[in-house]
Amino acid sequence: MADRDDERHAERDRDELVAQVSYLEKELSVLRRKLADSPRHVRLLEDRLQEAQTALAAANAKNERLVSALKEARDQIVALKEEVDRLSQPPSGFGVFLRARDDGTVEIFTNGRKMRVNVSPSVNVDELRPGQEVMLNEAFNVVEASSYETVGEVVMLKEILEDGERVLVISNHDEERIVRIAEPLRDEPLRAGDSLLLEPRSGYVYERIPKAEVEELILEEVPDISYSDIGGLNGQIEMIRDAVELPYLHKELFREHKLRPPKGVLLYGPPGCGKTLIAKAVANSLAKQVAEKTGRDVGKSFFLNIKGPELLNKYVGETERHIRLVFQRAREKASEGTPVIVFFDEMDSIFRTRGSGVSSDVENTIVPQLLSEIDGVEGLENVIVIGASNREDMIDPAILRPGRLDVKIKIERPDAEAARDIFSKYITPDLPLHPDDLAEHGGSPTATVNAMIQRVVERMYAETEENRFLEVTYANGDKEVLYFKDFNSGAMIQNIVDRAKKMAIKDYLENGSKGLRVSHLLQACVDEFSENEDLPNTTNPDDWARISGKKGERIVYIRTLVSGKKGADAGRSIDTVANTGQYL
């Protein structure tokens, strides 16, 4: 029984082992199949991993784009919100600050009303200045400081009131108004006659406007013309130096001798003889004398060149205003101790004899204005008036009387000696001289130049047939022959030299022969005479004679003695001559 049980147990164990072996064989077979499939599976997993990584990178890039778009959208929303808030704000107005009060409020002027308002804590009240613009919110409180007004009306200052903060001005319609002085003008010296910028609503003047038409009358500070540059006028130069420089340089001596210095000088004579040059040389000489007297390296003087016709204005009172401003400018400069020359060129054009009927009678108000200004110079040092004219007979006698234009100096046409002196200013030894001319004088440039000047002066001043210019008939029947020398001037001499130099340049360009020759000067002299032969044409020979410097018996007839280009002499009668407007 026991054996049978053992057999059954052994058989059962054997079956279990067989089953276990069969199971393991199956498992082994499965594992072998899986092992055979594992490389392909690994590759598949690797491919899936790479695809997943690529998808992840794309997702990250998309996420970044979304973040950027969201940020941009948020910024746009913020900007739009700010724009909406800004556009929805009420408009800000502007006002003009008047003054601050002790309680922290300020007074402003806006929309035609004077208001007392509060100030934002961001605005420093102590930095606000009268007349300054300020920005206002909807409650008219000051929230920001602005600048000053830059546009408005131009008015003329008439008077500064006693408080120094207000002025009396005159508008373009001759209306008087009292206005306040804004801060930018508080420290500037204001004078009657100044042009100011007015903002009419607030009543503040902000700026002084320079008058361009008056500034243009000022030619230069120190002219570069000296007495050594002027030839043939030594006597006149000595006279004007005595009249102008002595009183300025030796004030004590004049005061000791109770001698009043002259207030004005009149330079008169034919055109082109050096009147303007002398006036400029006076200013230059005074500047040098000031430098020596004060010990400075550079002297200073002012030369106010007033061109007569430029002063005239079609509006009533404008010419007089210009004259006042000119003398006001002279007083300003002279108050600094600087000599000032006020030079009126072509004085007869604006200061004609009153009531003469030869103009529009504008001189009836202009002449008194000048007289009052000249008389006003009496108590003012360092200012002298110099007038120049070639028709001194047309200037109002009140201007020429002693005490106004005290010294009268006639600038004559140059004689032969004066002409040599003038030529020496333009023909100098340092110029290129032709070798042939140099050889004739031993190679000496100085001797050559002197010989050239002597030859051309002899040609100009010879009373020969070829130099005969005019025959004039006087009212008493007398006749006189005038030569070209009778109409010579410094300007004509300069023109002759310029012509000769141009001829020398053309000769050098054409044939290579360089240098100035005496033949150039002689030919230039002939050409200059030929050009001027047709100039004495006028309906009134007597007026022409006065301008040309020929005074005396009235001239009734002029006949030219120079053969014209057509070879015919032509007598010119006062009844038949056409007025060309040209004068010799």
Curated annotation (Swiss-Prot):
Where is ATP bound in this sequence?
Answer: G272, C273, G274, K275, T276, L277
The record's listing under NCBIfam families reads: pup_AAA
Stretches for region Docks into pockets in the proteasome alpha-ring = 583-584
- Cellular component aspect of the GO annotation: proteasome complex
Flavoprotein is among the record's keywords: no
InterPro entries with a match to the protein in the record: AAA+_ATPase (IPR003593), AAA_ATPase_domain (IPR050168), ATPase_AAA_core (IPR003959), ATPase_AAA_CS (IPR003960), NA-bd_OB-fold (IPR012340), P-loop_NTPase (IPR027417), Prot_ATP_ID_OB_2nd (IPR032501), Prot_ATP_ID_OB_N (IPR041626)
An example GO BP is: modification-dependent protein catabolic process
| Described purpose of this protein according to its UniProt entry | ATPase which is responsible for recognizing, binding, unfolding and translocation of pupylated proteins into the bacterial 20S proteasome core particle. May be essential for opening the gate of the 20S proteasome via an interaction with its C-terminus, thereby allowing substrate entry and access to the site of proteolysis. Thus, the C-termini of the proteasomal ATPase may function like a 'key in a lock' to induce gate opening and therefore regulate proteolysis.
Coiled-coil residue windows: 8-90
According to UniProt, this protein's pathway is:
Protein degradation; proteasomal Pup-dependent pathway
User: How the protein assembles, per its UniProt entry?
Assistant: Homohexamer. Assembles into a hexameric ring structure that caps the 20S proteasome core. Strongly interacts with the prokaryotic ubiquitin-like protein Pup through a hydrophobic interface; the interacting region of ARC lies in its N-terminal coiled-coil domain. There is one Pup binding site per ARC hexamer ring. Upon ATP-binding, the C-terminus of ARC interacts with the alpha-rings of the proteasome core, possibly by binding to the intersubunit pockets.
Per the UniProt record, the source organism is: Thermobifida fusca (strain YX)
Q: Name one Pfam family in it.
A: Prot_ATP_ID_OB_N
**Name used for this protein in its record:** Proteasome-associated ATPase
Q: Give a GO molecular function annotation for the protein.
A: ATP hydrolysis activity
Instruction: Extract the PROSITE patterns matched here.
Output: AAA
Spell out the family assignment given in the record's similarity comment. Answer: Belongs to the AAA ATPase family.
Q: What is known of its domains?
A: Consists of three main regions, an N-terminal coiled-coil domain that binds to protein Pup and functions as a docking station, an interdomain involved in ARC hexamerization, and a C-terminal ATPase domain of the AAA type.
This protein's UniProt keywords: ATP-binding, Chaperone, Coiled coil, Nucleotide-binding, Proteasome
